[in-house]
A protein has these predicted regions:
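Outer-membrane beta-barrel transmembrane domain signature
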Residues: 147, 158-165
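Flexible, solvent-exposed coil segments and beta strand-coil junctions
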Residues: 14-22, 29, 63-74, 106-112, ...
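Gram-negative outer-membrane beta-barrel transporters
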Residues: 48-49, 54-58, 75-153, 173, ...
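Solvent-exposed loop/turn segments connecting transmembrane beta-strands
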Residues: 10, 115-119, 155, 160, ...
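C-terminal beta-signal and adjacent terminal beta-strands/loops
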Residues: 57-59, 146-153, 168-214
Length: 214
């Protein structure tokens, strides 16, 4: 067993898009945050497990809100004065024969501390589960990604449904410093949205070569 704890601070300035696009507001203030987490980790043989409690408090969180002072009637970027993310992450892995299993679950409460409402476009639940193995010189695997529903607006009036995606991947070393990579994301060509009216990628195939000099 191993226990760890950490605290930290962060700062993020608004981008040019946040300030000067159709949805931008030139007077946006930068974000600042304070983060704290406590974790407990276990490793034994072919198994690992961890549980991490976290809390992140953000001042002037930059997020997309309703109609405001920008040029768009659809909505504008705005600062949320006081926001908080807190929750727990469970992660683990286990080898069964030649198969490596792994997964993680995030349970969080993203909320506006002034209104008590859920932060826009942030889901409360996320999970990833996968498995991979060696087959004929290749590392091949599959993973499932799932997310709970989220609200598109700060008023929590427009709901974006949850989704589940299946991805496949494979890789093999073709030379000392080169690895051939292939991946299919969103195998079932699932339609889903992270922001209303904005499309996400359908089934996507990637092929590439990774160079890692040794």
């Amino acid at each position: 067993w191993r226990a760890t704890a950490s605290v930290g601070t962060a700062f993020r300035a608004p981008t040019l898009y946040h300030r000067f696009s159709e949805y931008g507001v030139a007077t946006l203030r930068p974000e600042s945050s304070r983060n704290a987490e406590v974790a407990l980790r276990y490793a034994q043989g072919n198994s690992t497990f961890s549980a991490t409690l976290f809390r992140n408090r953000v001042s002037n969180l930059i997020s997309f809100g309703g109609a405001g002072t920008c040029a768009s009637s659809f909505g504008c970027y705005a600062n949320t004065a006081r926001a908080e993310y807190k929750g727990v992450t469970f992660a683990g892995s286990h080898r069964v024969g030649d198969v490596q299993l792994h997964g993680s679950i995030d349970l969080q409460r993203p909320r506006d501390l002034d209104t008590g409402k859920q932060l826009a476009r942030r889901a409360k639940q996320h999970a990833t589960f996968g498995a991979d193995t060696r087959l004929a010189g290749w590392t091949v695997g599959a993973e499932v990604q799932a997310s709970g529903r989220r609200f598109d607006t700060v008023a929590n009036t427009t709901v974006l449904g949850g989704y589940t995606l299946v991805n496949l991947y494979a890789s093999t070393r073709i030379a000392r410093d080169y690895t051939l990579l292939a991946r299919i994301d969103n195998l079932a060509d699932k339609d889903y949205q992270l922001a209303r009216t904005y499309a996400t990628a359908g089934r996507t195939v990637y092929v590439g070569v990774k160079w890692a000099p040794q």
